[in-house]
Amino acid sequence: MNKMKLFARVLVLMTAMTSPIHVYAAASQAESNAAEKNVDIDKSVNLQNSINLTDGLAEENQASNVMFSPTSLNFALGMIAEGAKGETKNALNEYLGTADFAAYARKYMNVIKSYNTEDENYGYTSKLKIADALWVNQGLTLQDQFQKIAEDNFEAKAEILDFSDKENTCNTINAWCNENTDGLIPEIMKPDMLNENSELCLTNSLYFESGWSQDPWDVSDEKEKFGDNEETKYMTSIGDTYYENGAATAFEKFYANNLSFIGILPKAEGNFTLDALDIEGLLKSEPEYDEVNCKMPKLSFETTAELSDILGKTGLENIFSDDADFSGIADKAVHVSSVLQKTKLELDENGTKAAAVTAVTMECMSAMDTDPVVKDVELTRPFAFLIYDNMNEEVLFMGKVLTVQ
């Protein structure tokens, strides 16, 4: 079985699983296949971008844990792609892995709603929520077509604000942020992020919460070593899936809402890059095993990342330049001035909460039965993780853990 078709995980990128849901009324099979093709997204491109950005963040924060949400970033960039033209549009399409992200967004937002069951499990409520919004400086007029796509495909309403009143503008956006992440991320904007040229801010929030699908993990009473210089108490459990390639081993552990956490342990000790782990190949691996024993620490950390420089190195430098063409967005020439993302992760023996908010600010230019094979994956030194949607091959969160302090 192709594991990429079933894959839902976490790694300071947290995500869920299954093949996309399509509903087409009175359509022939050929028409249905064509419609699916129009909204296909290149998951290999998406995964590699996730890896590149997570490695870039880790390079900038070498002593810290980092987590990043590809899904949140892609929805924010997907909105501005709908108003881009020419070279700017081509660059965004290439990064997003599709020429019609709006259609993908509409489809995947419906999938996300199916995970938001509100079921209670070990003190956690099963939730997966995504939200988008447009914050428009008074005096800027959005193009009708852009505003319609934002509302129809991203469910993003436009609110007019006076950006010269920086404090009120930030308070309004932050209140939205707090509400849509259930208080996990109470703030994304600060007044010094706005200037006299700021005209538009597009925000996306992603919130995940769920208990584990099986019994809670066991928690040790004694501390053990993590890496070479730290100690922590560990959780242990039986995993659902085991993966292995030449660079890493991994376990997958499902949540109650069918999303999953994937813990990835490099075979080589010491620091590592996610790119070197061949995560795509790892998740397609089908090693023989009968049981996988999992061991990992509880996690609680947050990441704040200005992504402009890293994105500029991935082929998106045009969107930040005066050559950017976003004439389909508004009646003024604008370009992206900053891309900020905040993420937070809380993971314990009963379940997980994870949230991300991305703010894009724009301004004017200028197997058969055999003897049991038991595998162990013990995250007792630096490791990577994913929160993944297996069914839709969507990486919700990706992360790298270097410390338990």
Annotate each PLM feature.
Residues 5-17:
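Sec-dependent N-terminal signal peptides
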Residues 29-34, 63, 101-267, 287-370:
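Non-catalytic, conformational "gating/processing" segments within enzyme and secreted inhibitor domains
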Residues 266-288:
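Internal alpha/beta scaffold segment
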Residues 17-34:
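Sec-dependent signal peptide cleavage junction
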Residues 35-97, 206-211, 386-388, 395-402:
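His/Glu-rich zincin catalytic helix
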Residues 341-343, 348-405:
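C-terminal soluble interaction/assembly domains
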Residues 66-75, 129-130, 198-201, 383:
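Alpha-helical scaffolds flanking conserved acidic
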Residues 1-2:
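N-terminal secretory signal peptides that target proteins for export/translocation
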